[in-house]
């Protein structure tokens, strides 16, 4: 039933998913992995990647704007002394530094969205660096979600984690 619904209402589901992704990031301060897995499961590898990247970038930009207006003093108080030496470098080429910052994995999503308020990054630079910088991580997670859909369709029972990890459909 779910697959029929998914195939018949792809545009509507895409709009709801995009809105849900934006809401997931901004007010709830969620991270992107569950959304990326769900996007791959529902939409497949390519459409899921585009929707998740767009939704997470918009949500992250809203979170950055919120932090810039309401949390800037608190963030500067907590973190400025640790990142004082980067402030001048960031101002010279903020897009490239932010892009490298977004390519790095392992930084909690909330911190990676709020920390650039220290350097007064322009909103357009933040949005486009986020849009480009999260592509590799999100593509991998969406591919895993897409592979999960294929594994679930093929098996009548719930697969083990080792079955999921070593299935070639996840990586292709």
Where do the protein language model's features map onto the residues?
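Membrane-interfacial helix-loop-helix
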Residues: 1-19, 53, 57-114, 118-125, ...
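A sequence-composition feature that detects small, non-aromatic residues
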Residues: 36, 60, 129, 141-143, ...
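Short amphipathic alpha-helical surface patches that mediate protein-protein
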Residues: 80, 132-133
């Amino acid at each position: 039933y779910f697959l029929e619904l998914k195939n018949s209402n792809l545009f509507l589901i895409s709009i709801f998913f995009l809105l849900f992704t934006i809401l997931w990031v901004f007010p709830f301060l969620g991270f992107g992995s569950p959304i990326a897995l769900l996007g791959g499961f529902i939409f497949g590898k390519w459409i899921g990647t585009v929707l998740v990247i767009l939704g997470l970038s918009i949500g992250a930009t809203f979170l950055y704007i919120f932090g810039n207006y309401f949390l800037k003093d608190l963030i500067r108080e907590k973190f400025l002394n640790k990142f004082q030496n980067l402030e001048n470098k960031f101002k010279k080429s903020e897009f490239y530094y932010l892009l490298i910052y977004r390519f790095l994995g392992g930084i909690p999503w909330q911190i990676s969205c709020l920390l650039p308020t220290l350097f007064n990054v322009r909103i357009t630079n933040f949005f486009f660096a986020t849009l480009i910088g999260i592509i590799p991580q999100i593509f991998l997670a969406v591919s895993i979600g897409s592979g999960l859909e294929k594994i679930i369709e093929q098996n009548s029972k719930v697969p083990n984690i080792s079955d999921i990890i070593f299935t070639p459909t996840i990586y292709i």
